[in-house]
Amino acid sequence: MRRLIPSTLTDTRAERMLGALASVVLLVIVLMVVSVVTKAWPSFAHNGLGWFGSGPNVDHQLGDIFNSPADPAHYVYKLSAWPLLYATALITGGALVCGVVFALLAAIFIVEFAPRPLQRVLEPVVRLLAAVPSVIYGLIGVLVLVPLVGNHLISTQRKESVIYVVQLSGNSLLVAVAILTVMIAPIMIALIVVALRAVPVGWREGSAALGVNRWRTVWTISVRAVRPAIIAAAVLASARALGEAIMLSMVSGSVGFAPNPLDGLTFVFEPARPLASAIVEGSEGFSVKPYGETLYAFGAILLLSSLFLSLGAHYAKRPLRKFGLTP
């Protein structure tokens, strides 16, 4: 007869194993952050706060860094990475705002309003879109959206208005945000759909019994209940958006230029170059010490941004719970 192991002993072993695995994961993350920041520190130390400021053409600055002596005592370059930071914030923020709105509306439609046969079609399609490689989205952008914007949305007069500042070709902030929105939306839709399905049916039935219409029930009951899931989906999507490089290199223009809102509508047609694209495009220069340190600095900014976003989302749930806005 088999000897039975007490459930408490089994639970204790499982807890210890999971705790050990969690500790290993935490250690790996800490080592990764320390390694990247350590390798990036010389770039920050050499430039000081000017690293985050604006200055001459950042592409020319990166060229000077590539040709700079390897000895830190003889560094002669300066880097002002504001155009890259600004482009990263614009593209990621724009795509995240558009993506959250689109994903929430799409998830509500799938769960609350779509007929059952249509739901069985839409959900696998959403999961499939979430798994499509970014280079495919980049090809669609290059072959479809970039020519469309360059040939039909940007007039000759608009191109000439900024010709002495930047060249408008279709590779633009608008295309980058549009494609990135389509890339990150399926991830958020899938997570929000799962959360909406977990909302107790009794809550909605109780609201309907009180005479509340269907849309008001969805917004006041279902959406309110899944706010933590929406936050989690947004954080996960923002992490992917921050790290996206290949697709953005293909459609954003890859020019170290800070799009100017004072240019009016032309602003959305101006090219940009986010940090992730700068890392990929300059990856062959890792062997050049000052250039490699600069690329590590770009990576450190992206890594720390993702960590702070995750921490921010975690602490954002506390006031929601305090005021009874989460289950």
Over which residues does each language-model region extend?
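Membrane-interfacial helix termini and adjacent extracytoplasmic/periplasmic loops
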Residues: 46-82, 138-182, 252-253, 263-267
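Interhelical loop and adjacent transmembrane-helix boundary motif
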Residues: 249-303
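Transmembrane alpha-helix signature in integral membrane proteins
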Residues: 79-109, 234, 302, 308
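Transmembrane alpha-helices
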Residues: 128, 132, 188-192, 199, ...
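Transmembrane alpha-helical segments of polytopic membrane transport and secretion proteins
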Residues: 1-22, 313-327
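Transmembrane-helix boundary motif in ABC transporter permease subunits
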Residues: 6, 94-126, 147, 313-322
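Periplasmic/extracellular loop-to-transmembrane helix junction in inner-membrane transport proteins
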Residues: 2-17, 37-95, 115, 281-292
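Non-cytoplasmic
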Residues: 139, 147-148, 230-268, 276
